[in-house]
């Protein structure tokens, strides 16, 4: 049966008031894991240890499983404790009418984001930045300048302000609104000081409420050609605050970046099950959020990293499948275990950059070093590595990519529990000149040499 009109956030709100009642525990502990397990068995999904898939038939089965996951489960609204269901036609309408390309930024600093394919020879867009990591007020501009000064970086992804005027940006407070505006304004100024005043940014990251997110669209702050973030909840959940934010973004004709990080070992379960949920989450970004692009980020429940063997496999299969069967645009975010100025951090980020570039990601977003949880532990050097590795990987044969990854991941995966803490931005850079220390340059060159020995050609 056809639909009356294309589905949007207003329809979601209406259905969230009348949908099937469900407890959150039942959703998290029964509906999601049971359906994911059922679909894995139904379609016989087995990734056989490949980071980037070569089996097109298995990819098609994965897409069918992800589509079915969204169709049969729907999305859980945490405010109303009800399930929002879509019809099959509504889902296909969203998939068939996605934004096929868009521009981030303005003037000579603008970049065009358009579809890539598995093994594409074009380097993906590099969205460099702290990626939601906490950054102290005192070095907020210098940290973001360190990314804007890197030519490998095309756009900036914001960090979180730990304070504004010395006060915590508590959700719902006037300081949250001030922080959201200040975050985006300072980053715009940092880009201008780096000689790239038209550079696009992605955020806001500091605010946690709808009022905070909406307030970042302001004079001197975010504009329509910046990526505007809205986040889904784990797994296949959303709150009504986010729906209100989507309504604002749509009404303002903003580029919408729908974000979510599926958890391996969490509610979804194992590798194949989590990838099914990841596919469903991708599709939901375009049905519910009318997204311009979806920012992925499979993360390991124990290690808090996106660079593990399991999460790289999930990311590689999810992206390659989305790229093969749809025109949806997808990015991935980077959370290594190790901190800046360590070889491990650079190798972790490199493994993900190889996986993402080869599997067809349009945007690489990072790097949130030290798992993105330690204040001031992120710098432009990690984004440089992400970009250089992407450039070296673009166009490689997938069989060669998997061979490199099978050699690279063992170099760091035994060290998760003892990952080096690394150094703060202030210890990695001259804060006045925004240049990396000699120590970091040597660490960087050492990591680069190891990657060359594995077969990358810079």
Curated annotation (Swiss-Prot):
Pathway: One-carbon metabolism; methanogenesis from methylamine. It comes from the Archaea. InterPro entries: MtmB_MeTrfase (IPR008031), MtmB_sf (IPR036655). It is an enzyme of class 2 (transferase). GO terms for biological process: methanogenesis; methylation. It catalyses: Co(I)-[methylamine-specific corrinoid protein] + methylamine + H(+) = methyl-Co(III)-[methylamine-specific corrinoid protein] + NH4(+). Keywords: Methanogenesis, Methyltransferase, Pyrrolysine, Transferase. One of its GO terms (molecular function) is monomethylamine methyltransferase activity. Its EC number is 2.1.1.248. Catalyzes the transfer of the methyl group from monomethylamine to the corrinoid cofactor of MtmC. Can form a complex with MtmC. Belongs to the monomethylamine methyltransferase family. This is Monomethylamine methyltransferase MtmB. It comes from Methanosarcina mazei (strain ATCC BAA-159 / DSM 3647 / Goe1 / Go1 / JCM 11833 / OCM 88) (Methanosarcina frisia).
């Amino acid at each position: 049966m056809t639909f009356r009109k294309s589905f949007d956030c207003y329809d979601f709100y209406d259905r969230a008031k009348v949908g099937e009642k469900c407890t959150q525990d039942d959703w998290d502990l029964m509906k999601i894991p049971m359906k994911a397990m059922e679909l894995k068995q139904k379609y016989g999904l087995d990734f056989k240890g490949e980071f980037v898939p070569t089996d097109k038939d298995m990819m098609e089965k994965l897409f069918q499983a992800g589509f079915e996951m969204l169709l049969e489960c729907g999305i859980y609204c945490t405010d109303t404790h009800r399930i929002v269901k879509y019809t099959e036609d509504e889902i296909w309408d969203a998939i068939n009418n996605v934004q096929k390309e868009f521009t981030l930024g303005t003037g000579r600093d603008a970049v065009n984001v358009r579809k890539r394919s598995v093994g594409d020879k074009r380097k993906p867009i590099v969205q460099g930045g702290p990626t939601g990591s906490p950054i102290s007020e005192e070095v907020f501009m210098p940290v973001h300048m360190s990314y804007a000064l890197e030519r490998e970086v095309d756009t900036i992804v914001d960090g979180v302000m730990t304070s504004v005027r010395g006060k915590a940006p508590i959700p719902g407070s006037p300081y949250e609104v001030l922080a959201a505006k200040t975050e985006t304004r300072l980053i715009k100024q940092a880009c201008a000081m780096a000689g790239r005043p038209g550079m696009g940014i992605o955020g806001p990251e500091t605010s946690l409420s709808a009022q905070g997110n909406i307030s970042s669209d302001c004079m001197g702050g975010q504009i329509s050609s910046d990526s505007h973030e809205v986040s889904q909840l784990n797994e296949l959940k959303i709150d009504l605050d986010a729906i209100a934010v989507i309504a604002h973004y749509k009404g303002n004709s903003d580029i919408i970046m729908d974000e979510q990080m599926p958890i391996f070992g969490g509610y979804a379960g194992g590798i194949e099950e989590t990838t099914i949920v990841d596919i469903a989450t991708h599709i939901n970004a375009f049905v519910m959020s009318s997204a311009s692009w979806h920012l992925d980020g499979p993360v390991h429940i124990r290690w808090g990293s996106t660079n593990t063997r399991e999460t790289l496999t999930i990311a590689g299969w999810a992206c390659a499948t989305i790229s093969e069967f749809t025109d949806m645009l997808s990015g991935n975010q980077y959370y290594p275990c190790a901190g800046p100025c360590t070889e491990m951090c650079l190798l972790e980020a490199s493994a993900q950059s190889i996986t993402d570039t080869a599997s067809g990601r349009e945007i690489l977003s990072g790097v949130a070093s030290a798992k993105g949880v330690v204040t001031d532990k992120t710098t432009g050097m990690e984004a440089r590595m992400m970009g250089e590795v992407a450039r070296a990987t673009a166009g490689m044969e997938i069989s060669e990519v998997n061979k490199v990854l099978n050699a690279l991941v063992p170099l760091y995966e035994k060290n998760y529990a003892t990952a080096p803490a690394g150094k703060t931005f202030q210890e990695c850079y001259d804060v006045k000149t925004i240049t990396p220390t000699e120590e970091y340059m040597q660490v960087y060159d050492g990591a680069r040499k190891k990657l060359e020995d594995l077969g990358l050609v810079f």
